[in-house]
Structure formats: structure tokens, C-alpha cells
Amino acid sequence: MKLYAKIPMKEVIYKGKIKRTGTGQGYIYMNDEYLGCRAYIIIPQKYEFDGADYYITIDEVMNKGVHPDNDHTCRIFLSRSHLGRECFVVIDDDMR
């Protein structure tokens, strides 16, 4: 069964690849304004953009916490199996 989602561009706070830490764990950097929030990490099979919305065929969705990194940034940690994959991050509205 495939899951599909339509996400407005203004709700996506990060779109990019999952990077690797020195220990091999995956992470996503973001601004410190989201520190302490919960975030949905959406890993797509494929996606399209029409100028206002992303249309995503979902492979996996995770709900993770945003952790401090230093004074100006924070990050979300992920497993090694997600390294290099494209992802979208949307903040949970209840946690803003």
C-alpha cells in the first residue's frame, strides 16, 4: 500500500539529504528556533513540486525530537540506514 501526501511549501522547514556525523550516525541541521520541538521526518519514494505544494509518495515517516548542537543550531539524529537519503522536515503544530 502506498501513502501519498500533499504538503504546502510553507510548512516544509528543511528539504535535503541526511548527512553523516563523525560517528556514522545520520543527522539534519536546522535553526535553533525549533529546539525542543517534535518534527516529522518524511522520506519519499518520489515527489513533485508544482510551485506551491509538494506531492509526495511516502516511503517512511518518523516523529523525532530536535536536540541542541551549539548556541545557534540544533539537529535531529537518525539511524545510519537513512544516510544520503532525501527527506522533508515538518514541525509538529502541537509542539510549536
Describe each model-derived feature in a short phrase:
Residues 1-96:
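General detector of folded, globular domains
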